[in-house]
Amino acid sequence: EDMLYRMFGIDAELLIDHAWGRETTTIADIKAYRPKENSISSSQVLGCDYDFEGGRLIAKEMADLLCLELVEKGLVTDSISLYVGYSRRLQKKSAHGTITMPVTTSSAKKIMGYTQELFEQIVDRNAPIHRVTLAFNRVVDEMYQQYDLFTDPAEIEREHKIQKTMFEIKEKFGKNAILKGMNLEKGATTIERNRQIGGHKSGE
């Protein structure tokens, strides 16, 4: 053993345990493990001031696109943060808040619902909106996906397959190859943003 420690240092302990069939990671260690936390986000400075309804539409579009990013990367989240900046004319303090979902998911249906709920909780209905930033916090591998009592796992799996198919179509034929009804509403920005790369028009 002394020779192994001289040759391999602290790794020698792992080699010795392995040789004797010992598992150095205990059940307690596994239960105590917490995956590394990350986040993904999206931000828009709007071309003109939006009213409450228009701002809510923008937030939902952003949530939908971030959900596709989760699916693409095999990730899930249980926390959403929203920042809304008002028109510069108002000199009004920005609105911001965070909502924690009872599930860990990449479901666009669920996440857009909670994004809308958060938007309605924190945003002044009478103040024109100029900037929206949305972030998904505590983003982890989809192996940590969790359901609540009101979730049908089969339905979530069907939605996940649809989202994955949508992503593949967009990758192959362009981001505007498949759209949702909200993307065609007045004030929606997804189509225009999809035509841009790094904030500049892509020439499509």
Q: What positions do the PLM features span?
A:
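DNA-contacting surface of Y-family translesion DNA polymerases
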Residues: 1-128
